A protein has these predicted regions:
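Surface-exposed, low-hydrophobicity beta-strand/loop segments enriched in small/polar/acidic residues
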Residues: 1-130
């Protein structure tokens, strides 16, 4: 079972090709994340073991969640707003940032590959690749 992360901004959409995920806590269940895409405004989302739910930015609990780095077995479910129709196999940019309690920021960048397109063609599933 892969983990789904749904990343939305205040307009309920986020362009995959410029997806950035940042958090001041370790990645883990209940962790508050922010998504920024170009000049679009950010919104807090949560990463859950299998699915996600929207949470406020103050809901992250430092020290009470297990560290979880983005790995190749994780799939991000995102709203695709690009001008080209998404298709399985399409490569998109993906970057993450993780700031630990020691205030050291750890960044992971790589490419995401669309592995599936939802029945709603604006929703795509992106698998992270280093």
């Amino acid at each position: 079972m892969f983990r789904l992360v749904k990343v939305l901004n205040s307009n309920n959409q986020c362009e995959v090709s410029r997806l950035k995920i940042a958090t001041t806590a370790n990645f883990g269940p209940g962790c508050a994340l922010t998504c920024s895409s170009g000049s679009l405004s950010s919104a807090a989302v949560a990463m859950m073991p299998d699915y996600i739910s929207m949470v406020g930015s103050n809901d992250a609990e430092d020290g009470k969640i297990d560290a979880m780095f983005v790995t190749e077995d994780m799939v991000f479910k995102v709203e695709f707003t690009g001008t080209t129709a998404p298709y399985p196999g399409m490569t998109v940019g993906l970057s993450t940032k993780k700031q630990k309690m020691d205030s050291v920021t750890h960044s992971t960048t790589g490419k995401g590959m669309i592995i599936d397109v939802d029945d709603n063609p604006n929703l795509v599933y992106v698998r992270f690749r280093r």
